[in-house]
A protein has these predicted regions:
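Helix-loop-beta hinge of the Bergerat
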Residues: 33-76
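Conserved terminal C-lobe alpha helix of the protein kinase catalytic domain
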Residues: 56-59, 63, 79, 83, ...
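Conserved ATP-binding N-box helix of the HATPase_c
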Residues: 73-97
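Conserved beta-strand-loop-beta-strand hairpin that lines the nucleotide-binding pocket
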Residues: 1-44, 90-176
């Protein structure tokens, strides 16, 4: 296992007024040619309807995409990271009433030099909150897992509404 500098157990918000990492909308899906799903260009995204079954759907999407990009070594960590980010968005970022949007959540994964970025956009502007649950708690460890598995964990507001939470994973030496 390669060593890397991790950002640790904190979320790093963007600078005030900074542009979000990315924001996906239904219209941008068509603009980016993503209506076909995964691709080999190093960018793939899918809309999620905000249901609890989105976590396994997201894991499968990431697995298929990374296998297509010949990044099988990242599948275990990336699928767990994405599963936790999607689960947090479903549990904490959606109103109980159905959102008017067909896809209130968007999952995007893309390659940057040396990194894989896994990002989830949701309609809530409430910042994500890392917790330190006691040993008997049955939940509250998701972002801690993401921090432990990733090289960095960030979030930013995505005007006009919502936020994007993303984690980066270092690419294997051969892929970087």
């Amino acid at each position: 296992m390669s060593t890397s500098t991790r950002q640790g157990s904190r979320l790093h918000a963007g600078e005030p007024g900074a542009e979000p990492l990315f924001r996906l909308t239904r219209s941008s899906e068509r603009e980016r040619g993503l209506d076909q799903g995964t691709n080999t260009s190093g960018f793939a995204a899918c809309g999620l309807d905000g249901q609890l079954q989105n976590a396994p759907q997201a894991r499968r999407f990431v697995e298929v995409t990374l296998n297509g990009w010949a990044l099988q070594l990242l599948v275990p960590d990336a699928t767990l990271v994405v599963s936790e980010l999607v689960t947090n968005a479903v549990r904490h970022a959606l109103d109980p009433a159905p959102d008017a949007s067909e896809y209130p959540l968007w999952l995007g994964i893309f390659l940057r030099p040396g990194d894989l970025v896994c990002a989830v956009s949701d309609p809530s502007s409430t910042p994500p909150c890392q917790r330190n649950p006691d040993d008997s708690a049955s939940g509250g460890r998701g972002l801690n897992l993401v921090s432990a598995l990733s090289d960095s964990l960030h979030w930013s507001l995505t005007p006009p509404q919502g936020k994007t939470v993303w984690a980066t994973l270092r690419l294997p030496a051969k892929a970087a």
